[in-house]
Amino acid sequence: MTRAFIREKKWERALAFQTRNPLHRAHEYALVYGVEVLTAQGFYAGAVLNPLMGELKGDDVPAATRMLCYRKLHSERLLGQGDKDESIWKKAGWDISDVFELIGLDIKMFYGGPSEAVMHGIYRQNYGFSDIVIGRKHADAPFEDGKAIWGDFDAHEIFDNLKGELHIQPCKVGFAAFYESLGRVDLTERHEGEKPYSISGTKVREQLQAGERPDPRIMRPETSDVLIEAYRK
């Protein structure tokens, strides 16, 4: 069904974005960046938010709540709003929202780090995707004491050393954050020595649980409102 959908769209490349989280703007930017790279290369490329809908850890946001966030992003054409590179889309002749789609994937999360990143690539290849976003700490979870099991970019490196016939291409994305100098989110590797605006994930959750919207430089109000309502129940 997904393969048929991609064919119907007539995309030359189809980029999948794997996630188990509601998207704050830095998360969202990984998909924006990935499809902009392909579009700038001259491809008519689709950007598919492809969240896992199966079993997760107990402290992860439930799938039903996350889907409300994702649907809001999709239906209100919010992807990349304020963060996309307008020059790329002007040259292409279409907008990022015109090639943005939402398709859930009903598999569980194993929190297996780099090996699971490869598994996620295999799944997406089987579904007809040509590319997959591989971010920092992909499929990551720490030890019980909070210490890291894997390095931030181990999932990037594993794709460099694969043997066999995995044809899907990893779109490797690093840290992203909001920069006042740009007035938008960008990759931190482009801003050496510049401090981004940031809030810890713990602080964001505390604000949402208290019924407060996090700073819109971190999370879109539309996403915040869905999560605030969910925490009230």
Q: What are these model-derived regions, one by one?
A:
Residues 1-22, 26-233:
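Active-site cores that bind ATP or allylic diphosphates and position pyrophosphate for catalysis
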